[in-house]
């Protein structure tokens, strides 16, 4: 479903604010998983199909189940709660992440996840596909006692800003004159969070929902009144979340999402009307940090981005779908890449989205990947001359020096680029039969994860470096190709 006013019934606002009685007409249903635990769920009210409030850790996350119920009561959203699994160390909201082929049948106690069952429960609660999932969690981290952290999927920076501002306004209004902690909200992608949720984002519930928010509250408040206050604040805030994300009354930029059986494709439109250039992250989950980098670089530069998530051995039965070419392969094997129907379909979908994002001819395509076998950035190219490569390298060195300065704790990574220099990772498969051959010019960046992504600070610095490099290099490369650049990077 696309998130626009056309998909929203005219009575939605009334439904949102006056559905506290909806629960009376939406019975709670139960499903047991023998020897492991049980689910409780309730279908979304009419007009709110696709929206689900989840509490995958039940009572193990203090009061998260009751908070999820109250939010579902208030909004009319569907409800999905899991009980009993966490105490047995059974994952609910994500599968077991596996890099190699694994058996399709499991028996207790080997089984470590009930994600497949939870996904079915979400579908029942949503009355179909999950357009918006909101998970409720509690933090056991004492350092996170002063804030609410929100992990997200499918949100733009502008949407995150609007949601943070809405929370601040609701909190300040309801907490005025009351003795309660003033919790800040830290929300992705606007801010980095301390909560590690990569499995949920790349393989779990935030992968399969078109848009998703996982909310983590402090373990406890100083008083029962504080608990009640923030339950009310969050309930009212989620009212706003549903309107902002589904109705988009502010006309904010939104990410277009294509959900597929083994993953998802996200398209971030150019914020500056740029045509002919696209950033790609075809291995956004397998190369774990590249999805986030592509999204942040797109925001900083205004260049359109297409990001693939999922399609890893976890989703594809031990195979990695290559996405930027019509093949798949088992990781760490020396065998050839396999052509398959599913790989061709996923590649076609990715290719078509790249061309749609380019808004015309694909003059320059930029692929972002990561690797861990060397310490240099390697850039494979198509259609780039030695002179152009030399200028890109010179720009990179200058920008790296400006941004890193004398900062000794972040390595100054060298860059090797074709055809100026020989590289080990030549991206030949994508050059011969993949996305790299379709653009007039292509650059395939392999970033050394142990250097550029080792810490949050390194990620931030190299994201800035990469964005600044594209701001300088892209206009030059496009002017060499077309004589002009449509749109502005500066």
Summary of predicted features, one role per range:
Residues 2-11:
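Bacterial N-terminal signal peptides that target proteins for export
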Residues 12-17:
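Hydrophobic alpha-helical targeting segments used for export or membrane insertion
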Residues 19-21:
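C-terminal motif of bacterial Sec signal peptides marking the signal peptidase cleavage site
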């Amino acid at each position: 479903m696309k998130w626009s006013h056309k998909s929203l019934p005219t009575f939605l606002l009334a439904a949102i604010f006056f559905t506290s009685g909806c629960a009376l007409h939406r019975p709670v249903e139960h499903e047991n998983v023998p020897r492991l635990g049980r689910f409780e769920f309730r279908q979304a009210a009419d007009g709110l199909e696709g929206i689900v409030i989840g509490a995958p850790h039940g009572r193990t996350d203090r009061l998260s189940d009751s908070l999820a119920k109250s939010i579902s009561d208030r909004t009319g959203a569907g409800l999905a709660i899991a009980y009993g699994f966490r105490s047995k160390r059974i994952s609910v909201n994500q599968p077991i992440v596996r890099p190699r082929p694994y058996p399709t049948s499991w028996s207790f106690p080997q089984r470590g996840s009930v994600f497949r069952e939870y996904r079915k429960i979400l579908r029942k609660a949503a009355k179909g596909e999950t357009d918006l999932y909101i998970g409720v969690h509690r933090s056991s981290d004492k350092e996170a006692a002063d804030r609410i952290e929100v992990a997200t999927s499918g949100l733009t920076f502008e949407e995150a800003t609007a949601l943070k501002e809405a929370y601040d306004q609701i909190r300040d209004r309801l907490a005025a004159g009351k003795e309660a902690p003033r919790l800040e909200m830290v929300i992705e992608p606007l801010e980095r969070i301390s909560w590690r949720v990569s499995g949920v984002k790349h393989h779990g519930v935030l992968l399969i929902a078109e848009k998703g928010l996982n909310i983590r509250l402090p373990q406890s408040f100083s008083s029962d009144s504080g608990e009640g206050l923030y339950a009310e604040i969050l309930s009212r805030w989620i009212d706003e979340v549903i309107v902002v994300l589904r109705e988009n009354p502010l006309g904010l930029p939104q990410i277009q999402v294509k959900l597929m059986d083994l993953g998802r494709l996200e398209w971030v439109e150019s914020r500056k009307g740029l045509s002919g250039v696209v950033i790609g992250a075809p291995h956004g989950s397998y190369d774990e940090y590249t999805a986030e980098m592509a999204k942040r670089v797109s925001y900083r530069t205004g260049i359109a981005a297409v990001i693939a998530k999922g399609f890893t051995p976890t989703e594809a039965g031990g195979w990695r779908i290559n996405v930027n070419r019509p093949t798949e392969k088992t990781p760490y094997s020396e065998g050839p890449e396999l052509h398959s129907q599913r790989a061709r379909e996923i590649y076609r979908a990715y290719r078509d989205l790249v061309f749609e994002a380019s808004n015309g001819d694909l003059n320059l395509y930029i692929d972002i990947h990561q690797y861990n076998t060397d310490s240099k950035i390697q850039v494979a190219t198509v259609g780039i001359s030695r002179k152009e490569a030399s200028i890109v390298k010179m720009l990179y060195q200058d920008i790296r020096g400006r941004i890193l300065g004398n900062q000794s704790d972040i390595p100054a990574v060298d860059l090797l680029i074709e055809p100026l220099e020989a590289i080990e990772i030549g991206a030949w498969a994508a050059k011969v039969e993949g996305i790299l051959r379709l653009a007039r010019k292509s650059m395939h960046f392999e970033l050394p994860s142990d250097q550029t992504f080792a810490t949050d600070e390194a990620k931030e610095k190299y994201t800035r470096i990469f964005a600044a490099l594209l701001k300088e290099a892209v206009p030059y490369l496009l002017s060499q190709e077309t004589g002009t650049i449509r749109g502005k990077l500066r």
